[in-house]
Amino acid sequence: MAKVIGIDLGTTNSCVSVMDGKDAKVIENAEGARTTPSMVAFTEDGERLVGQPAKRQAVTNPENTLFAIKRLIGRTFEDPTTQKDKGMVPYKIVKADNGDAWVEAHDKSYSPSQISAMILQKMKETAESYLGEKVEKAVITVPAYFNDAQRQATKDAGKIAGLDVLRIINEPTAAALAYGLDKKEGKTIAVYDLGGGTFDISVLEIGDGVFEVKSTNGDTFLGGEDFDMRLVEYLASEFKKEQGIDLKNDKLALQRLKEAAEKAKIELSSSQQTEINLPFITADASGPKHLTMKLSRAKFESLVDDLIQKTIAPCKAALKDAGVSAAEIDEVVLVGGMTRMPKVQETVKQLFGKEPHKGVNPDEVVAMGAAIQAGVLQGDVKDVLLLDVTPLSLGIETLGGVFTRLIERNTTIPTKKSQVFSTADDNQSAVTIRVSQGEREMAADNKLLGQFDLVGIPPAPRGVPQIEVTFDIDANGIVQVSAKDKGTGKEHQIRIQASGGLSDAEIEKMVKDAEANAEADKKRREGVEAKNQAESLVHSSEKSLQEHGDKVSETDRKAIEDAIAALKSAVEASEPDAEDIKAKTNTLMEVSMKLGQAIYEAQQTESAHADAAADAKRSGDDVVDADYEEVKDEDDRKRSA
């Protein structure tokens, strides 16, 4: 049976894992790393780079290197968080025809689902390379506090990447699965997940294979990216004070600042001080300018203290919703790269009154949990029951714009709930059902997920028709809503798709684009491999010809030289043809065989001569020494007498 993989699609980094026997194994990517930067870049010549190769060239290509795309997924362009993000990134965020936030690179627009799909494709290829077989099914994680539009957009990304997404699972829940799979005794745990772009807190009861989420809370726009930007702003303002130049207007300088900020942040988790050194960051009439600054851990902590404090209110809300006090939490599990920061750990310790558990790898535990859930769905992992919750209340807009809840937040999913409503006016023949998600009392203040009309209601006084509205949330946390006129039996049902969101036709087009790109990427890779092999063969052939050319006839030598020249010409062409390079590589290999044979024969002859000389030496060395006695002749005896 084909394996189902688990993918942690992160804001900053992504990770893929698979069940290996009874354990979840994190798979290394082509670059040998266990996590992959969630970055996609488009180069001048149309090449698409994903992961570490994209990150490496970000400084020289900031406008076409897309990162932290997860923060835009499922969001509209007018969303305040989108507008905030616009000022934080060097690439363009644009308004799509449907009002969604899309991104632009080299004058081409992409949906966040499309860019996320490119990262998912990379994770898919990583798994396929390790497993040696095709991968078509996956479990993908999302922040627990993602709304329906964001979950749907993530599922769309999986589809575009060629994956059948069996389950969307919340990141803290996945982490709890990986942490508690072998725990038999009952425990109440809190998972504090501060990642690259989002913050989640979940309270769970775990024990003997049952994982029940009691509550969840969070902030989908709070994470490591904000910590980095806070430091970037500080560095830019200090530089402006010293040099009078605003680096924020220079996208290339801004990208260098961002990389330096991320590096400094990581170093300050283990050191009390770090030095930021950026030579030639900019220039003016007086010449080049350099940025050099010492930064202490205490200064960095003061810059980001309010961001850390923003995690406290969601933690308190989650504890309240779960009906437990901080003292009743047996263990606090830290997840996400930002939890390596000592100040974050100290804040968690103060809040919960205990040392947080650091026994899991915060970068890998979510992907491992996704792989365990994949194992559960596949039947490889037995006796595990996972009960998750919906993070936000769901309801409809009723008379006066009031938000009427049908499903309260932290309700265990899957779930189904119905409620009967009526008309607001006499002889009303149609009603518009406006579905929202959130915690505010007025519908306009919550996230509108979608709307639809129920038509054909028979004329009747207001309040008489009975319209039953049913909400159905599946295990992925994705909502389906239906409305039924109980008098006529007429029903209208929709899977909620955000007022923006991708249509099925758009998704299908993106799937085809992704497949075409995968084919183009494969051809490009084959071309590079063919070129590398050709250049290596040219080098070795020229060297062999130089050293041993006198061992073959003039005709053979000329044939090799011609083949080398032809292959060089193919490699150096303005648009190299992989098939042409392969054919000319084979030709050179064939004509070089005579040279190789001559070298081999010459070596054999030399070896034979060497063996003969050695044998001769050995036979000379075998002469036996004889004992002898000196005998004097007669004359000698006479002379001595």
Curated annotation (Swiss-Prot):
Instruction: Relate the induction remark in this record.
Output: By stress conditions e.g. heat shock.
- In Swiss-Prot or TrEMBL terms, this protein is called Chaperone protein DnaK
Q: Which domain of life is it from?
A: Bacteria
Taxonomic placement: Bacteria, Pseudomonadati, Pseudomonadota, Alphaproteobacteria, Hyphomicrobiales
What is the native source organism of this protein? Sinorhizobium medicae (strain WSM419) (Ensifer medicae)
Q: Which UniProt keywords apply?
A: ATP-binding, Chaperone, Nucleotide-binding, Phosphoprotein, Stress response
Q: Which residues carry this modification: Phosphothreonine?
A: 198
A Gene Ontology molecular function term of the record = unfolded protein binding
Functional note: Acts as a chaperone.
Record field: compositional bias (Basic and acidic residues): 514-529, 540-554, 608-621
Instruction: Name the gene behind this protein.
Output: dnaK
Q: Does the keyword ATP-binding apply?
A: yes
